[in-house]
Every structure is written in structure tokens, then in C-alpha cells.
Amino acid sequence: MSEFSGVTVVREANIYFNGAVASHTVLFPDGSKKTLGIMQPGEYTFSTGAAELMEILSGELDLQLAGETGWRRIGGGQSFEVPANSSFTMKVQTVSDYCCSFLS
């Protein structure tokens, strides 16, 4: 889905890592939530509360989920899930556009 209808967008941005990662929150009528964002090249570790589905819309990164020893290359058009109460590290290789869905 390339666009969302009938949603509320939170005006204030979510800024991480001194501005290298930024997103905006999108709230849906059914109570679900997504963030749409952009990541500059660099290495970033995030922790999760809820489980997440990360869709990489464009760009390229290397991914390591908590407990994994190796890295996986993820590119535009691919996605990955992160369990609740976990963490993941990304080595972003090129500017990457993403959509993060919070799963219940």
C-alpha cells in the first residue's frame, strides 16, 4: 500500500541518533499505529516494546536481531519482524525509507 486514507498524522517528528533517523507517527481509526521514516547511513540499535514489522521501502541495510550472530542484507521491497521486548541493530548502507507497523 503506497498511501493511507482516513488517518491522523502526528505533526511532531520522532528524532533519533542526532537526527540521523527521523519518523512521523500515523494513527489509524482501528487504533493501530505505524511510523514512516528515513534513516541516514550509520549503525543504529533500537529496542522494542511491541512486536514490529519493518518494511524497507528503499535503500539497503544489514540487520542483526537480538540473539543472532550473523548479519542479513535487507533492501528496498523487503521486510522483517522484530519480537516484542527485544532489540535489533541495523547498519544502514544507503539512505533508507521505511514503514514500521506495531503489531499486537
Swiss-Prot record:
A GO molecular function held by the record: guanosine phosphorylase activity
Q: What class of enzyme is it?
A: transferase
Record keyword Glycoprotein present: no
What's the name of the protein?
Pyrimidine/purine nucleoside phosphorylase
The chemistry this enzyme catalyses reads:
a purine D-ribonucleoside + phosphate = a purine nucleobase + alpha-D-ribose 1-phosphate; adenosine + phosphate = alpha-D-ribose 1-phosphate + adenine; cytidine + phosphate = cytosine + alpha-D-ribose 1-phosphate; guanosine + phosphate = alpha-D-ribose 1-phosphate + guanine
List the residue ranges forming a coiled coil, or say none.
Answer: none
E.C. number(s) listed in UniProt: 2.4.2.1, 2.4.2.2
Pfam families reported for this sequence: Ppnp
Give the GO cellular component terms, alphabetically. Answer: cytosol
Q: Which source organism?
A: Trichlorobacter lovleyi (strain ATCC BAA-1151 / DSM 17278 / SZ) (Geobacter lovleyi)
* This protein's encoding gene: ppnP
State if Transferase is listed as a keyword: yes
Q: Which UniProt keywords apply?
A: Glycosyltransferase, Transferase
Query: What family does this belong to?
Result: Belongs to the nucleoside phosphorylase PpnP family.
Q: Which domain of life, per UniProt?
A: Bacteria
In terms of CDD domains, this protein maps to: cupin_PpnP-like
- Function per UniProt: Catalyzes the phosphorolysis of diverse nucleosides, yielding D-ribose 1-phosphate and the respective free bases. Can use uridine, adenosine, guanosine, cytidine, thymidine, inosine and xanthosine as substrates. Also catalyzes the reverse reactions.
